[in-house]
């Protein structure tokens, strides 16, 4: 019974990860939350003091997100926000913003 429960859980986790990868809008949908502070499509509002995310190299964004998630980089709210995403989701978000101009 325990083995069956474990297999069912693994199947659901795998299916959820595959669903994100198969959805061409997954990165955009996940990144929509970022617009509240960083502006629509990552174009920060002038004078806000927040970093623009649009067009930033994917690796640079991923490193910043990893630093926020681990607590290495100081932040007021990004620690909590970044911890709410899986590494796969953060990768999708970084890919989306890197493609924005």
Residue positions per predicted region:
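Gly/Gly-Pro-rich "capping" loops immediately C-terminal to redox-active cysteine motifs
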Residues: 42-70, 79
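C-terminal capping alpha-helices of c-type cytochrome domains
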Residues: 70-73, 82-101
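Electrostatic cytochrome c docking/interface patches
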Residues: 12-31, 45, 49, 67
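Residue-level hotspots at or immediately adjacent to binding/recognition sites across diverse folds
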Residues: 21, 40, 81, 96
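Stable alpha-helical elements in mature extracytoplasmic
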Residues: 23, 30, 57, 64, ...
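Bacterial N-terminal signal peptides that target proteins for export
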Residues: 1-7
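Detector for the c-type heme attachment site
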Residues: 37-44, 98-99
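The canonical Cys-X-X-Cys-His
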Residues: 32-40, 93
């Amino acid at each position: 019974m325990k083995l069956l429960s474990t297999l069912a859980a693994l199947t659901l986790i795998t299916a959820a990860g595959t669903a994100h990868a198969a959805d061409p809008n997954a990165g955009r949908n996940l990144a929509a939350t970022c617009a509240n502070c960083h502006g629509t499509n990552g174009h920060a509002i002038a004078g806000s003091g927040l970093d623009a995310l649009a067009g930033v190299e994917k690796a640079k964004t991923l490193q910043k997100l990893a630093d926020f998630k681990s607590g290495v980089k100081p932040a007021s709210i990004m620690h909590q926000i970044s911890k709410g995403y899986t590494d796969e989701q953060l990768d999708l978000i970084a890919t989306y913003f890197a493609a924005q101009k």
